[in-house]
Swiss-Prot record:
<feature type="binding site">
    <location>
        <position position="206"/>
    </location>
    <ligand>
        <name>Cu cation A1</name>
    </ligand>
</feature>
<feature type="topological domain" description="Mitochondrial matrix">
    <location>
        <begin position="46"/>
        <end position="58"/>
    </location>
</feature>
<keyword id="KW-0812">Transmembrane</keyword>
<feature type="transmembrane region" description="Helical; Name=I">
    <location>
        <begin position="15"/>
        <end position="45"/>
    </location>
</feature>
<dbReference type="Pfam" id="PF00116">
    <property type="entry name" value="COX2"/>
</dbReference>
<protein>
    <recommendedName>
        <fullName>Cytochrome c oxidase subunit 2</fullName>
        <ecNumber>7.1.1.9</ecNumber>
    </recommendedName>
</protein>
<feature type="binding site">
    <location>
        <position position="195"/>
    </location>
    <ligand>
        <name>Cu cation A2</name>
    </ligand>
</feature>
<feature type="binding site">
    <location>
        <position position="197"/>
    </location>
    <ligand>
        <name>Cu cation A2</name>
    </ligand>
</feature>
<keyword id="KW-0460">Magnesium</keyword>
<keyword id="KW-0249">Electron transport</keyword>
<feature type="transmembrane region" description="Helical; Name=II">
    <location>
        <begin position="59"/>
        <end position="86"/>
    </location>
</feature>
<feature type="binding site">
    <location>
        <position position="197"/>
    </location>
    <ligand>
        <name>Mg(2+)</name>
    </ligand>
</feature>
<feature type="binding site">
    <location>
        <position position="160"/>
    </location>
    <ligand>
        <name>Cu cation A1</name>
    </ligand>
</feature>
<keyword id="KW-0999">Mitochondrion inner membrane</keyword>
<dbReference type="InterPro" id="IPR036257">
    <property type="entry name" value="Cyt_c_oxidase_su2_TM_sf"/>
</dbReference>
<dbReference type="GO" id="GO:0004129">
    <property type="term" value="F:cytochrome-c oxidase activity"/>
</dbReference>
<keyword id="KW-0186">Copper</keyword>
């Protein structure tokens, strides 16, 4: 959950998000190093006179050709590794289908019989004390902690996007097309997200709430919901 005046990322709650935060820090260090080098060279040019030999030197041309290539490699390798990790879905313990509508989400637990529900935002007038405005829903997505979860995402009308920042998940929901993503929650808790694709007048009223619980609690919840 983001805090007021927060500048950094939310606390990572999945291995993918942890990797994304580390890559952000890595890229930021590289960018700061480049900025420092450029500022140093600018200051040196302003304070010192340049000779024609320095401008036309082959060594300088070689350096400013090789250095950008090294920088690109330093950024590309970890980026490609994370991209492959985000696309890899290996034997999930649970498959969840998320369907975007104007303006709510429908969920189907395909591994269970008759376990599906619609998830609407709770209006501000009905919101209990201590809950978050425009983020709470009447039915949360409950998943077992530390288990691979596959999410199949589509839409029933227009473009939507299923996004939960603290899990490092953001996948477009496209009518007539099935996209998929996966995540593993590393701790129990409640994680908030929203539709991240402009989808109409009430686009900002499509929150997503994922609740991560230990496996026994998830089994009890699924049994209760299936029997009701």
């Amino acid at each position: 959950m983001a805090n007021h005046s927060q500048l950094g990322f939310q606390d990572a709650s999945s291995p993918i998000m942890e990797e994304l935060v580390e890559f952000h820090d890595h890229a930021l260090i590289v960018a700061l190093a480049i900025c420092s080098l450029v500022l140093y060279l600018l200051a040196h040019m302003l304070m010192e006179k340049l000779s024609s030999n320095a401008v036309d030197a082959q060594e300088v041309e070689l350096i400013w050709t090789i250095l950008p290539a090294i920088v690109l490699v330093l950024l590309a390798l970890p980026s490609l590794q994370i991209l492959y990790m985000m696309d890899e879905i290996d034997e999930p313990d649970l498959t969840l289908k998320a369907i975007g509508h104007q303006w709510y989400w429908s969920y189907e637990y395909t591994d269970f019989k008759d376990l599906s529900f619609d998830s609407y935002m709770i209006p501000t007038t009905d919101l209990p004390n201590g809950h978050f405005r425009l983020l709470e829903v009447d039915h949360r997505v409950v998943v077992p902690m530390e288990s691979p979860i596959r999410v199949i995402i589509t839409a029933g009308d227009v473009l939507h996007s299923w996004a939960v920042p603290t899990l490092g998940v953001k996948t477009d929901a496209i009518p007539g097309r099935l996209n998929q993503t996966s995540f593993i929650t590393t701790r129990p808790g409640i994680f908030y997200g929203q539709c991240s694709e402009i989808c109409g007048a009430n686009h900002s009223y499509m929150p997503i709430v994922v609740e991560s619980t230990p496996l026994p609690y998830f089994e009890a919840w699924s049994s209760l919901l299936s029997s009701s």
